[in-house]
Amino acid sequence: MTIFKRISSPALLALALFGGAAHAALVPPQGYYQGIEKLKTGEGNFRCEAAPKPYTGPLQFRSKYEGSDKARATLNAASEKAFRTSTEDITTLEKGVSKMVGQYMRDGRPAQLDCTLTWLGSWARAGALLSTDYNHTGKSMRKWALGSMSGSWLRLKFSNSQPLAAHQAEADLIEKWLSRLAEQTVRDWSDLPLEKINNHSYWAAWSVMATAVATDRRDLFDWAVKEYKVGANQVDDQGFLPNEIKRKQRALAYHNYALPPLAMIASFAQANGVDLRAENNFALQRLGEGVLAGARDPSHFKARAGKKQDMTDLKVDSKYSWLEPWCALYHCVGDTLERKHDMQPFNSFRLGGDVTRVYDPSAESKK
């Protein structure tokens, strides 16, 4: 099937028409080729839980910031509880797939792989998460889930152990569904005004990038790169993102939250011969350095955002998962490298699981 037959979005069509000549197949960073860590015999104590019910309803969810002012920085406990309840099956799928893929890549037990394929296959057959009846929180859940699933899928797809070789029909079904989700995600997040482009758009672009490589879709890859460039060019000379500064007391936390998708996109682009490191005068490096400095002394963020910073998230090691791809891009040394080593291993289900095993596998053996 040609790229033109698959495209249903004007944004993707434009990229397809002007994307140039044919390219080599898309690939992930080198760490995704790793095989099973240590093949275990027997079933062990792994038990395949029943798959969460495929979510096929409208993607209309309450925001956990419901009722907050325009800074969107104050949690609403009641609406957060409603959000968690209504999205529970989606989050269970994300976390479950990430965990099972991690277990399989560690142990190689067939039951772990079979369960992963059963879960994803049931959602793919149901056409889950494809509703076009959605609000902002709903389309946000769609792209988060897509990034989680495609990020995990990459570890199976490209592993030298070739776990999907004996499951090609199921893999094709799942990848077709991931492609459809990516196409809808492109429609969801294209053509936004600059003042509306923030961390959500970066996470959408990461989910599309992961899917692009998992399904070898150059049109999706090009869209993700385009969105990355928009994000990188939002970083000002001081390393701030104006649309995250608006989050007032959570400005620093949201700068930190913007980094994982941007760093992953740049890493995947580099693996395919597209070097984004210097975009907007090394914006990604500047952003990361600013967050690391802010985590130590948030006074600059307080001055810029006009509020004392909420440091809760900045004390959680896993929130710095972006350090793995970022340090691979910019070759961290000294204090930054030491901080990374102190916090490893990094595991983020929204990035597909154990990012330390992908980017710095020798570090895990030292723990």
Curated annotation (Swiss-Prot):
Q: Which GO terms describe its cellular component?
A: periplasmic space
Q: What is its EC number?
A: 4.2.2.3
Main location per the UniProt record: periplasm
Question: Which keywords belong to this entry?
Answer: Lyase, Periplasm, Signal
Tree of life domain: Bacteria
Q: Where in the cell is it found?
A: Periplasm
Q: Which reaction does it catalyse?
A: Eliminative cleavage of alginate to give oligosaccharides with 4-deoxy-alpha-L-erythro-hex-4-enuronosyl groups at their non-reducing ends and beta-D-mannuronate at their reducing end
User: Where, in this chain's numbering, is substrate bound?
Assistant: 63-64, 136-137, 254
Family matches, as InterPro entries: Alginate_lyase, Alginate_lyase_dom, Chondroitin_lyas
SUPFAM superfamilies per record: Chondroitin AC/alginate lyase
Membrane spanning stretches: none
The signal sequence is 1-24
| GO MF assignments | poly(beta-D-mannuronate) lyase activity
Which CDD domains does this chain map to?
AlgLyase (cd00244)
GO terms in the biological process aspect are:
alginic acid catabolic process
Q: Return the similarity comment.
A: Belongs to the polysaccharide lyase 5 family.
**Chain's role:** Catalyzes the depolymerization of alginate by cleaving the beta-1,4 glycosidic bond between two adjacent sugar residues via a beta-elimination mechanism. May serve to degrade mislocalized alginate that is trapped in the periplasmic space.
Query: Under which name does UniProt file this protein?
Result: Alginate lyase
Native organism is Pseudomonas putida (strain ATCC 700007 / DSM 6899 / JCM 31910 / BCRC 17059 / LMG 24140 / F1)
Its gene is algL
